[in-house]
Amino acid sequence: MTSSPVLTATGLVKRYGELRALDDVSLTIRGGESVAVMGASGSGKTTLLHCLAAVIAPDSGSVVLSAPGVEARELVGLGEGERARVRRESLGFVFQEHLLLPELTAVENAALPLLLKGLRRPDAERHAAGWLAALGLAGMEDRRIGQLSGGQAQRVAIARAQVTGAPVVFADEPTGALDSTTSAEVLTALLHATTGQGRTLVMVTHDADVARRCSRIVQVRDGRIVADSAADATASGAGSATGTLAGAASLSTGLDR
C-alpha cells in the first residue's frame, strides 16, 4: 500500500538575479521515504531542499506540508516568522556541520528543541537522554561537544533533530565532513532514527554510496529534476527499526500535549 504524501511541491521557481536556481520543479515525497537529492555544485539541489523545508521562499510555486500529526498547510506565502514556527514545530534538521553549541553538554544540545516548545528542563533532558542512548551515546550525556568525536557530535545533532518527533527530517550533506567508516555509521543511525521509525528523510548528498542507501534518488541539473527513481536500498536496513530506537521513539509521544 502506497503511503500518503507528506510534502508536495508544484512548479517551484527560484531566481538569484538572472540565474534560475529552480526552474518549474515539481516533486511529491511520501511518508516513510528516504529521498537522496543529488547534483553537481550549483545544480539547485540545496535550493530545492531549502524551499521544501521552509528555510527560504520560492519566487513562485507551491509547497504543501501534510505530514502525520501536522495540519496540512501551504508553506509558500508564509512570512519568516510563520516559516520559523513550521520549522520549529514540524521539521527536523541535520547539517554537514553539526551546529551544536560548544558551551552546552550533549544532552543540553539535544534538548534545545523541547525547551523551545515549552517543556520543563528535567523532562526535556530526560527525553533527549533517551535518544542519545538509543543512538549509542549512553554515558556521554554530560560531555561537552569538544569532548566528542565528529561522528559522536553528529549523532547528537540527529538526536536534536528527532527529539520532538518531527515527521520530516531534512539533512544537508550530513556525512560530508566524516571519514568513510564514520560516515556509514552515522548514516545508519540517521536512517534508523527517521525512516526506521516511519518518518521521512530528505537528504542532499554528493556521495553515491550514501544515496544508494536511500529508498529513492532525485537528480537535479540546472534547476530541474532530470531523474527520479528508486535506489538500491537492500543494504540500508532503513525499514527495520532497532529495539533501542523503537523505545526511543516512544519518548517523543505526547510531547505536544
Task: Indicate where each model-derived feature is located.
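The feature captures the beta-strand-to-loop junction immediately N-terminal to the Walker
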Residues: 38-40
